Each structure stands twice: as structure tokens, then as C-alpha cells.
Amino acid sequence: MGGTIDINKISKLSESAQVDALSTQPFPASKKIYAEGSRPDIRVAMREITLTPTPLQDGATEENAPLRVYDTSGPYTDPAVEIDVRRGLPRMREAWINDRADTEHLTGATSFYAKSREQNLSLDNLRFEHRHAPRKALAGGNVSQLHYARKGIITPEMEYIAIRENLALEQAEIENAMRSQHPGMNFGANTPRYITPEFVRQEVAAGRAVIPCNINHPEAEPMIIGRNFHVKVNANIGNSAVTSSIEEEVEKLVWATRWGADTVMDLSTGKNIHETREWIIRNSPVPIGTVPIYQALEKVDGVAEDLNWEVFRDTLIEQAEQGVDYFTIHAGVLLRYVPMTAKRLTGIVSRGGSIMAKWCLAHHQENFLYTHFEEICEIMKAYDVSFSLGDGLRPGCIADANDEAQFSELRTLGELTEIAWKHDVQTIIEGPGHVPMHMIKENMEEQLKHCKEAPFYTLGPLITDISPGYDHFSSGIGAAMIGWYGCAMLCYVTPKEHLGLPNKDDVKQGLIAYKIAAHAADLAKGHPGAQLRDNAMSKARFEFRWEDQFNIALDPDTARAYHDETLPKEGHKLAHFCSMCGPKFCSMKITQDVRDYSAKLEAEKAQAEGASQQEAEQGMQEMSQKYKDAGRRLYHEV
């Protein structure tokens, strides 16, 4: 946010907070467009890239249609929207929630902890001031998208998602695009050529997809997580006891959505977690996830043994009333599984998993998240918070991959999924971790089998352990593979993984690596229309439309910068070569020359054939006339 602000030197953060102008600039040659649905307030945002014309041989040009791409940046890249992080984003879903008439406004926060924070006057300079009263389902009600889907209701959120997944293309346009796309191999996925609102409803009703959208986060643009839709990417942000501030985390949020984060997890473990989260949610156009056990641990001064159900329950309500869209809950770490990790090379590497394992051993009791799971479901369905069932026993190195502890927990997560579904609570399953390439497919197969096709959400996996500083590369390989096999969402890894807290540039690097992985998975699955952007890039590359190449890229800034390092002049962006091969050895220029030469030969051949045909016809006419002049006789005396 334009530099770190010392909160001790200002009266209120709500008077000074601002977002970096770089984070709100539209992408080059791009504009925000909105596709309208069946009602005027269903306006689906996406990005449209303007392409330059193709120069033809005769000096004329041929227009190239603009390219639409999926956009997660929300209003931040729309110049028509005034951005003020002190007030938060427009509450786009509020009317839809009102129309359902199944919620009530509370008079204020009901969490004991939230109330205590509100009464603490020393926090006034940190508060997000423009708060709204939280909502909750009417007594005994259920407001989850899964509940509506199972009742046969197509919600505005579902319609929005169908338009968004299709990039507002008509069915005929997608069918036409599929003629220039490889069919792919989808390993049992069932994506139709054209996604309808009814298909979205069916997938949600079956539990194969989730729409994370807490009723207290109406600022979020509806999105879907499921293997029959585009593969999604999550970015982690959050402060720690060592570094970062509220304004830095909001800046990281905006930056992450700019570079393609479909969801963002706030993993804050430092000071002022409650206030930080409020600022993040109010300014987030994407769903926000958390790991509630982190904050619960802070409430008991970091002593895992002192955790209890009452503290955790209050934390769930606190975060649900703020608008958190999905909770990672490590309810599958059972007491009997903990000894299975003793022989591992790296033991338990999940923070949440280790916290619950320590609690279980200290009390010699079953995990209270497991024993109170149905009570957790009651809380979740009153706000439409989705489960992200945490893999607390995931492998922390490739030596521990696919072991007894990991798959025992996975089977328990499958059991918990069915309990959650009984309550109509949306559920996704978290996965590893560190897995070598030849063992990745087994993870996907086991998850589909035991978790009844609930969406899978994995951290990578990293396919080797020797890449510190480059873990976004090694995990991106695993992410692309498991996305192809059917994983619905990939949790990004940054270059700082295992090394430190990521900064803005690390967030971008991790996201670009994972957008590549997700897109590669879509291509490999043959997702309808996935190859449109690749084909547009290839055409621009062959025609030496350099500006279009930069603008179509996932990271236009870096593409342009790398080109300009060696060919900085504007005239070089019209050149039919780059610095890799130079003007004489450019394969595409040579190919164009070959094409031109072939076209010339064909023209000459056609001309020659035309001339020969003309001579033959003239000869035929002469012989015909000679026949007529001779009295039309077949034979003549010699």
C-alpha cells in the first residue's frame, strides 16, 4: 500500500489506508467487460484483450477478434469503479441474499471474543469502520448453496458461475473453438461442451463442486471449485509474529487477485488477527479461507494443551460472522493415527495437524474437532461456510508419501464428508504435500474413492525435496499433474516456501507458476475452450505481433521486459525476429518465407497451366473449324 504506515503515528488506519496504484491499473490493451444474466444485477466480470490486426501480403490488414479471459481481480482493475479500501468493495450479492428471505440481521457480533475486541478502545485506530451487522440463517434454517441445489433451486450465484465458466461465449462459439483444440484425457471427469446453470446446480447437489460464499461476504464474486470446471488456484497470505501489518496484508490480497488467485487464505498468526481479517474480507472480491485453530491457539497463549471446544466454537462463530467463506478444520487427525507418524522422516508437518496431535496426546482423548463435528456442521450451515477438511497428516517429504498415516486420515475425511453432506454443508478435501511424480495418481484415485468425488484441494504436491528457492517450480509440476488427474483447486507455493514469509513479488511468482499448472491441466483434460488463449498466442507469435504476444501472456509485464532487455526500441516490436535467433535464423520468419515462395510457385504453376489450357483450347477450335471447312467429312481422299 504505497509504503508501510506506522500505526502509532496516525489517528486511524481507516483515515489513511490506500492501495498501491500499480495493483489497480488495468492490464495492457485490456478492459473490464460485464455479461448480464437473467436479472440486471447479475453482471459477470471478465477481461477482454484487444488484439491488433494481422498484416496481409498486399498491405491490407485482417481484424483479430478480442480475446476474453477469466478475471479474478474484481473491481480493482475497472477504471469506472472508485476504489477506497477504507470503505470496502460493493456488496454485489446483498440483494440476492435479501430476496431469499431466509436470514436475519443480528444486532451485532455474538462471539464473546469479537465483543471483547469491540469494547477495547485501544484498537480504535485499527478498526475497519464501515461494518455491517452480521447475518445468520433463521432459526433452524440452512442457507448453503448445497441446500438450495438439493431443493432444485438455481440461485443467482449458480447462474453467475455458468456465465463466468463459459467466458460469456455462446454455445456455438465454444463448439467452433473445440474444432481447433485437442480432445484431451479427463480420467472420468464429465465436463459438458457448454456449462449451464442447471449443470452447476447438479454438480453442487451431488457434492462434486462447491460455491464458497458466506452470506456475510456479499462482496465476493461467485466462483466454483470442482473437477468439471476450470482448475482453480488459491494464494496464502497472512501476518506472523515476526513481520507484516494490516495494510501489507490487504495489499497482498489485492495483488494476489490481480495475478489470478481464485481464493485467498488468511493464515495470520501474529497480532490483531481479528482486525486484519475484517479488512481483508471487506476488500476481497474472492472467497476467503482460514484455519480457525490458529486463532484459537492465540487465544490460549499458544499452549495447545489449553485448547478446548468452547474456545474453538467461539472462534468459528466469530469468523463466520465476519464472512469467512471456508474453514480448514483438521478433524481427521485421530488419536490412533498419531503413532503411525513416529517412523516418518519428517513426522507431522501440518501446523494444524501438529496442534491437534499434541492436544490428543496431552489429554489422551479423541480430537475434539472430530467428536464435535456435527455441532460444527450446525454452525457452518447457518452462514454457508464450506468445509476444507484439512490433511493434518500430509507427508512433509517424498520419503513419507502415500504412507499409512496419510491414507488413514483420508479415509476418515471421507466419513466426515458424508456427515457434512447429511447437514447440506459444502465440503472440499485437502491433500498433499510432497509426492514423487509416479505416486501422484494414486492420491487422486484414493481421494475420489474414499471421499465420494468431493473436490480435492492440494498443496502442490512438490515432486522433489531439493528445490528450496524454487519450490514453486517443483510443486508446479506436481500441481499440473494432479490437476490433470482431477484435482479441483491447487494451493500455490511461492519461492519462499520452507524459507520465509512471502512478499508481494513472491506472491506473484507463486501465482504465475500455478496459473500455468492449472491451465496446463485444463488443456490436458480437454476443458472446452481452454485452448483459445494458446491459439491466439500462437497466431500472434507467427505473425510477429509482439504487443499482442505480451498482452496475451499470463504476465505481460515480464514478457515485455524480457523482450526489451535486448531489443528496447519501439521499432523492434514491429520486427520479424527476436534476439534469440536474429533476423537470418528466425524459424518462423523462414517458415513465412517458405510459405511465400510456395505460394509464388503455385501461382506461377497455375498461370502456366492456364496458358497451356488456353493454347489447347485454341488448337481445338482451329481443328474444329478445319473440320467444318472440309464439309464435315470424317474421311478424305488422298
Swiss-Prot record:
Q: Which InterPro entries does the record associate with it?
A: ThiC, ThiC-associated_dom, ThiC/Bza_core_dom, ThiC/BzaA/B
Sorted keywords for this record are: 4Fe-4S, Iron, Iron-sulfur, Lyase, Metal-binding, S-adenosyl-L-methionine, Thiamine biosynthesis, Zinc
* GO biological process entries: thiamine biosynthetic process; thiamine diphosphate biosynthetic process
Biased region (Low complexity) positions are 608-624
Q: Specify which residues bind substrate according to the UniProt entry for this protein.
A: N236, M265, Y294, H330, S350, R351, G352, D391, G392, L393, R394, E430, Y457
Identify the EC number(s): 4.1.99.17
Family named by the database record: Belongs to the ThiC family.
Summarize the subunit comment.
Homodimer.
Q: What does this protein do?
A: Catalyzes the synthesis of the hydroxymethylpyrimidine phosphate (HMP-P) moiety of thiamine from aminoimidazole ribotide (AIR) in a radical S-adenosyl-L-methionine (SAM)-dependent reaction.
What this protein is called in its record is Phosphomethylpyrimidine synthase
